[in-house]
Amino acid sequence: MKFFKGKKDKTLDEAYDTLEKSVKGIDENIEKYNKELNVIKQKIEEEKKKNPINQHIINSLRNKAANIIQKKKVYENNKESTMGIQFNIDQIKYANDNVQLSIDTYKALKNTSKVLKKNIKKVNINKIEKLQDDLFDYIEDTKEIGNILSSSYDIPLNLDEQEIDAELALIEDSILDENVEQDNIASYIEDDKKEEDKNLLQQIPVEEKNFDAIQQKTKKETYFAQKES
C-alpha cells in the first residue's frame, strides 16, 4: 500500500516556465550588481577629484568592484546557459506540436474517409447516369415541342407566271373599284351640300334679301365717294 504518490513528471511547458522564472531572477541580480558598480564608479571619480588623492580608498573600491563584476559574470553565464536550454525546449515543443498536428490531421482524415466510404455506398452511379440521360432527353423533347409550336403553317409558294399576273390584275381592279367608289361618295356629298344651300337660300325672307342688297349698295356708294374726294 502506497501512502505517498510519486512526483508527476513535468511537461515541457512547465519546464519552460521554470526556466523563464530562473532567467527573470538572474536578470534581477545582474541589475542589482549594475547599480552597485555605478555607485562604486561615482565614489572613485569623487576620490580622484580630492587633493590629495587617497589612493588606498580608490584601491579598496576597485577591489570591491572587481568582486561584484566576477559575480555578475557568473550570473550572465548562467543566463546564457538557461536561455540556450529554453531555445532547445522551444525547438522540441515546435517539433512535438508538428507531430501532434500530424496525428490530429491523420485522425480527421481517417474519420472523414469512413464517413465518405459510408455515404458513397448510398450513391448509385448507374442511377445518376440514367437520371442525367433522362433529363437530357426531356430537354431535347422540350426543345422539339417548342420548335413545333413556333413553326408557321406551310403555305404553297409554287406559283407560275400566269397565276402571279392574275393575282396582280385582281389587286389593280380592286384598287380601281375603291377609287371609283370614293369618287362617287365625294360627288354625292358635294351634290347633297349644294342642294341644302339652295334650300336655305329659298327659305330667307324677302326683307332680309332687300336689306342685304341695300347694304351692298351703300358700301359701293361710300367707296366711290371716297375715291372721288
Curated annotation (Swiss-Prot):
Keywords linked to the UniProt accession: Coiled coil, Merozoite
GO cellular component: multivesicular body
Application in biotechnology: Possible candidate for an effective malaria vaccine as determined by epitope response in sera.
Cytoplasm recorded as keyword: no
Record InterPro entries: Snf7_fam
Pfam families the record matches: Snf7 (PF03357)
One BP term from GO: vesicle budding from membrane
Similarity comment text for this entry: Belongs to the SNF7 family.
UniProt-recorded name of the protein: Putative vacuolar protein sorting-associated protein 60
Species for this entry: Plasmodium falciparum (isolate 3D7)
